[in-house]
Every structure is written in C-alpha cells, then in structure tokens.
Amino acid sequence: MAAKEVKFGREARERLLRGVDILANAVKVTLGPKGRNVVIDKSFGAPRITKDGVSVAKEIELEDKFENMGAQMLREVASKTNDIAGDGTTTATVLGQAIVQEGVKAVAAGMNPMDLKRGIDAAVDEVVANLFKKAKKIQTSAEIAQVGTISANGAAEIGKMIADAMEKVGNEGVITVEEAKTAETELEVVEGMQFDRGYLSPYFVTNAEKMVADLDDPYILIHEKKLSNLQSLLPVLEAVVQSGKPLLIIAEDVEGEALATLVVNKLRGGLKIAAVKAPGFGDRRKAMLEDIAILTSGQVISEDVGIKLENVTLDMLGRAKKVNISKENTTIIDGAGQKAEITARVNQIKAQIEETTSDYDREKLQERLAKLAGGVAVIRVGGATEVEVKEKKDRVDDALNATRAAVEEGIVAGGGTALLRAASALTVKGGNPDQEAGINIVRRALQAPARQIATNAGEEAAIIVGKVLENNADTYGYNTATGEFGDLIALGIVDPVKVVRSALQNAASIASLLITTEAMVAEMPKKDTPMPPMPAGGMGGMGGMDF
C-alpha cells in the first residue's frame, strides 16, 4: 500500500480553499451576457472555446492532491446542478466559492463548523421557499423564448427556435440538438411516430425521384418474429388485396421467399406494399412494437400471446392516415389509436421514467414518450467553423434545459436579482451566535452572482448592487446587456426557479462539507527513481570494429 500524506485543521481547509478558488476563478468569468470565453486545450484537433461553466469545470485537474480535492468537490456542484436543471452551473460555482470562503474564515475565527452548517441549511431552506413564492408560471411562447435567449447568452434566434420547437411538439415532445453540415442553424420537426428503419428493398419505392415509399390509409401488420415462409403470410395478403388498401409490414426481418413474393407483387401492381424491420433490440423492440400497435389500434402478432400469422384477420391490423418510408426512416402519421389507450400508455412510460436509475434507459423512454405524445424536433446547429459550432451547441443545450426547467417550476427575475432580494428577505434566526453566523454567510453569498455578472460586464459591482437594492420592487434589477435598470421580467431577463434553486442547494451542500472538513488524506507523490547508468565501454559485442 502506498504511503499517505495527512493534513489537519486549518492547513487542510486552506489547501481545499486554494483548489476551490482556482476552479471557481476559471469558471466564473463566463457568467452573464457579457461573460468572457474560456479556451480549453485539446490533445488533438483545435482548442475548444466555451462559455459553459460545467465544460470548464470538467477540464480542471490540479497537480497538488489536496488542492485538487477542493477543486473536484466544487466541480461536483456544477455537475450536480447540470444533472438536475441542465443550466446554472456557473451560478452554482460562484455561490459555492462564496460560501466556502466565508465559512473557512468563520471556522478560523473559532466558530463551531457544525453550528455554521445548521445556520447555512436553515437559510437555504428559507430562500428556496421564498423563490417558490415569488415564481411566475410561464404560459406563452414569447416567455419561453425569453428564457432560452438568456440561457443562450443573449442569442435571440436560439430562444425563438426553442420556443417554436416546444410549440410544435409540446412540452412532452423530444427536442434534440445536433451539429449541422451547413453554416445555418435550422429547426426540423417530425410529425407522428418516426423510427430509424427504412424499406427492406428499393423495389418498394413509390416515388423514384425522392426514393421514398408513400402509403395512403394503409393497413399495418406488426409481427414480432422473422417472416420467411410465404404460406403463413398468404391469408392476410389476400384479405388486404380484396380491401384495395396498401399494406405496411413491420417485422424483425422479412427474407427469402416471403420478401421475393412481396417484391414481385409490388412490381406487377397487384399489391401496394412495403416492408421494414422492427425498431430497437430485445425487450426494447417488444415495447416499441407495442407502442406502434397502440398508436395504430392494431395488435402485435406474436406466438407469446397465442396469435399465429395464418389466423390473422384485418381487424387485428393497425391503421394510419399515411406512412412515409425513406431509406433510413419510417414515419407513421395520424395513427388510428384510441386517445384513452395512448394516454394510458404515455402515463405508464412516465412512471417508468420516474423509477429508472439508468440515464441511458431514461433517454430511450423519453424518446418513446415523445413519439407517442407529440413528435420530435431537431435543432441543427450550424456555424462557419467546427469550433464555433461546438461553442454554439453548448449554448443551445443550456437554453433548451433552462426552458424545460422554466416550464416545470416557473421563473423569477434574472441577473442574480432573485437571490439578492431573497437575501434581503431572510428572517430566519439561529439558535446561537454560530448558527446566526451561518445564516449571515448565506446572506452575503447570495449577492455573489449579481456582483460577478456586473464585474464581467466591466461595471463596479458594489454600485450596481447598491442601486438595485435601493428600489424595493421584487423584479427591479440591472440589465447588463443594455446597461439599464428596470423591471427585469418585463424586459425578459428571467431565470427558471429550478435552475436558481438547484444552484443554491448544491452549492450549500458541498460548501457545508468543505467547511466541516477537519482532516485530509492523499497519496504521497511517487519519487521517480533515476535510470541506472550505462556500463563503461559502450554496448557489448562492438569491439574490434573500424569506423
């Protein structure tokens, strides 16, 4: 076991604080509409330029083990806030640094760390309750656009695009962000249910120019297993031919004799048909086929439930107004499913999302939910260079997360103003002087985000904060982008409650742990042993050679 180095008391806390300061000072320059950029070196490719706090925090690793512990604990504040709210990482870092700095000073002055922690917790609880009380629910598309614009560092076109996407696919719909191949940023909305499987044979194409197969008012056969035997498929094919409607077959695979017969029938014009593979794999495939069945009012043909293919009748097939199939994707538009059944399925998936602990499973469940509930919107982020695209994509991701958080818990005045007001409204009393000191630590720390936003804009922070506090209106604050004071909610300078609340709660949680730290243990740095010197006379076996 490697030897360990141990630090105690004041020395331990000072080393922690040094690490906290290094990370926070690198992150906090990005805060606000006039925040600066941070350039991150990459071992290959161009350096990355970002104004995203958590991206900066994740890149910082310090040489000194004890300082690094402080930096990593503060990084946890940013990461946790990003996981919960998807934005507010820089605010959380600034709050965390402010609480730790004040707390370490208080402990050095002889105060009881545990009482300080109790005071900090009591103050944070009251501030969070105050934020919920002041929160304003957002209803309109314009308000959603405002939240997106603020989180995208003032880029109005990003805010508007996110508002448009949310309007089209609903709050339950999936909005994904991808890098575009062009310089333009654009929004694409896919209506209905789309899955990433295309036609099994190009002979199914109905529009040779676009290479797509369009089926109007088709029957949909949903089969769990492979289809290779033609005989079992014949009864259902004959029934569909007599109905005069097109047919879409969704199965694990269609091959051999069955596929050849379908293609021949399509080419002869006897049957308008297309076949695609079922989406997903394993249990997820079963669940997605069930989703398609509910959406189209059909049944999954599976021997597990005792239905054989040769016994299938037309009323077991799904229906939709239109199906569009390209080489890569199949889109089912306006399925004939019952609204009550679709709602029940949506609620079932929501319950699974609540229960799952896996991020991957949650993402896949949310995709399924969107396909059933509304649709999918894709924001393709473009730019002149790869570096610009990556930086812009970070901002779009932040803006998207912030708008979702705003819809969930409402909004408060932005620019750090809500926390400033909450500091003034703190009335909770501590049980002793040390707890009172903990409450005062939070009261002072709540000013830090507003001060940092002003500092990054080149303003005198104390003057700006003083002027804001002179006016008692809750929403009165400073618009850093224009340099004017006014009603921030009316000006569209807003923050989601979920973002502000998560930032404060996570900052206080980690800061309390750092303040109550009394000992630190780290591995001693390994001493590199020098290579032994080469023996005299060079390499063996070289004697007697003439040069």
Swiss-Prot record:
Compartment annotation: Cytoplasm
A GO term for molecular function: isomerase activity
First-listed, main subcellular location of the protein, grouped into a coarse class: cytoplasm
EC numbers on record: 5.6.1.7
Keyword terms, alphabetized: ATP-binding, Chaperone, Cytoplasm, Isomerase, Nucleotide-binding
Substrates-to-products reaction catalysed: ATP + H2O + a folded polypeptide = ADP + phosphate + an unfolded polypeptide
Subunit structure, interactors included: Forms a cylinder of 14 subunits composed of two heptameric rings stacked back-to-back. Interacts with the co-chaperonin GroES.
UniProt-recorded name of the protein: Chaperonin GroEL
Species: Bartonella tribocorum (strain CIP 105476 / IBS 506)
Organismal lineage: Bacteria, Pseudomonadati, Pseudomonadota, Alphaproteobacteria, Hyphomicrobiales
